[in-house]
């Protein structure tokens, strides 16, 4: 795959490695760093001192398993214990205890966390790196104005400006600016020190008048001047300690803390040698920045490209978790300080355990995972989705951009993205370009930068050495592009290669090349790398394909693709969908839910995932691949997961497709399919829905789960057991009771029905005072009950003691309205399901499975689907599978076409079917109309592409309403499927009906069917007795609402009723 002459062997890194490395960095370094920052806490009399001993902290292994945490809605976390000491200064006694600080959510083998039973993942964020950046803008006179922006670690910004007279100003707010001399003086320098530390002292002296000298005469004067401009305070403020503290808090802490990365960037940009541990902005930094700004004014130095990746940093999982840990420790410090003071006040003897409570840390992390924009619910539609979600990069989030304000330049592809951020895989819509995906080989470096690997080409060494370079480093090298991998050094013409140098693309001699790419997939994300023949597709269609593969539903019988790229096995392995042997041994027992592996003198039980629900309601299930008694090795696959076959990703099916218009049924991307796909369960998928109900303890008593529900029909309760919960294996329909529940309530004597009062008076029967609050199966939920769980929360309050969950499995065949897609952005909706005898058929009598519109190919420019289609046909006839790396034209011109035609020709010879490859129209064939038996006029492309069924299914979207709830104010039906809402007849619909003159239908839609309260009540009665519907005389509710709104604007509006007989006008009050 990497060529013959100059290849090196490299393995693709684990796709979850980014998440693992981030979490390990947090556990190893982040925890310790934040714990060391925890201060020593003293009481008000300074007699007692509390401190933490960081060296002895420990994390305890969780007591519960991951699967139990999901089912019981718990957090899979580890308890953090730290040694703490309480020192009495008078007696010099110390009490030391190991204290429990709180729970830290752990990361599992998929790179995700389980919080309150939900899989959550933390997204990496791209931020502007702290440091100084220079740019130039034109003012209103067309003159270039140079500015230097200092960005702190907190995201705060300060600007240095240089005006026409070469005076330098520091902008402290949008409107206020002060002289650089005042700022330097306020930071502690006098005039002599300032002039000694700058390269252009004469420029600084040129704008030093008497007024300026007075301002910087002393540090106090400078601070007062600075405070006056920064806080916009009028009058004459007085210098004080509190004024300095306020300035320190509001300005210097937020805008002058550079951090570790900012200090490194500042030193490199301004040629400084300030130690790395000095993370605050110093006067020396300000003066060096001013010198650089003066140099730019006179044509020395270069401006910065703010969108270059060398000026960005990645805020990884480690940084986000460390920030939250620091926040939790600040809250813990406040709690300890308050507890010490309270204990002294009440003359109690405190101990370290009594002073520290766990809620600050636990609640901080729970709120972070639940509310932070970068913590998202893991998308688990299929195995590919899980991996891709963890490799996302977002410009959005706290301290970042927003979809409304981000410019086109930020969203656009930048040359520095090469090999680091995928140029194809991004969101569609308002977030396009703001949410990207990591390239396959990219990694996050020590300084928060994205690094990409290259092979070093050296004449001195014959071996191949791999380098990881940060975004700024590779600009100094000549980097050969991917098509140099198969370079033949013996041919003189091929010694000129395309290369990249300083963001430009050149053609240079091979001897001048310093580095070369290591892999054809190096530039792309996982989703884009799974598209065969991607080089023949338009990038917009490749983007749609990489997004739609994540929406593919796992099918009941998966099938691996005939034409792939070779990355399917790695994607399946890293997804966690497969069961893999952790050690070698022999299989001694197999079952649907577990495998027993014997080895090293003991037996290991490996549990399998059986009918597990994902958060997109798809079915996660593992199927055995190894027989009983077989000896296996470590790392061998024991069971396939959902959407995997033989350890490879299998998201769809290879089906026989013809590209031909058919009676308009495939107009505008509609798709025609055969009934074989339904009857043989080709595109059948299982979906699992979860329904839950809680039992509370009310003021009238506890709610009761029972099967004795009064006033309900018996057939609705037929599936309940003695406890009142639906039985496993039951088939349930819409409206059936899943859990019977009664809620006690106080009922007044007057509210009893007459028959209830009669029973109480004559027979003395006590009528039930409970209200029925059962869990009923909503519309569209019919299916088979596969699991029931009655969960009591550990340590839960009596307010919400129990939860009952019912899991129902649905079998969904493909039907009209479902969405299908290929791997090249070719998507469509099923428009009709034809009998197989009516479908077009091939010369060997086989009917095609799908009919696509050929007009969807040329305008979309996704020709890769044609290559895949024809090669898939050859592969199915020859019983071969192809794994083709992209950009195979690097070997020779028209390599893809030659491969496809040669395989079709071989298939034609081996199967003795000349129609497979006809030289007059290669790749096409004469096919016949199934209805008439006549051949179509033109030869047609037929083949076997890989087609996916997507999560956008008609069962989840189609909706109808006969009756339902109404809005309180307008009395119109609610909106939306979830609320059993109705359709709105808007302006354009009214115009359409007016155009056809259907006055009575229009009146019905605007009155009876909408918001006329009295009229819609009369409709029910007249429908039952078979009478005629009366004409409504008064106004509908929305008209009455409009009248009242106009009255609030002092406008009176009335309507009148004109009699048909005598034309009398009767005024009606709205």
UniProtKB/Swiss-Prot annotation:
Which leading EC class covers this enzyme? transferase
Its annotated compartments are: Plastid, Chloroplast
Return the GO cellular component terms, semicolon-separated. Answer: chloroplast; DNA-directed RNA polymerase complex; mitochondrion
Family annotation (PROSITE patterns): RNA_POL_BETA
Q: Keywords for this entry? A: Chloroplast, DNA-directed RNA polymerase, Nucleotidyltransferase, Plastid, Transcription, Transferase
Q: List the disulfide bonds.
A: none
Q: What does this protein do?
A: DNA-dependent RNA polymerase catalyzes the transcription of DNA into RNA using the four ribonucleoside triphosphates as substrates.
Subunit text: In plastids the minimal PEP RNA polymerase catalytic core is composed of four subunits: alpha, beta, beta', and beta''. When a (nuclear-encoded) sigma factor is associated with the core the holoenzyme is formed, which can initiate transcription.
This chain belongs to the protein called DNA-directed RNA polymerase subunit beta
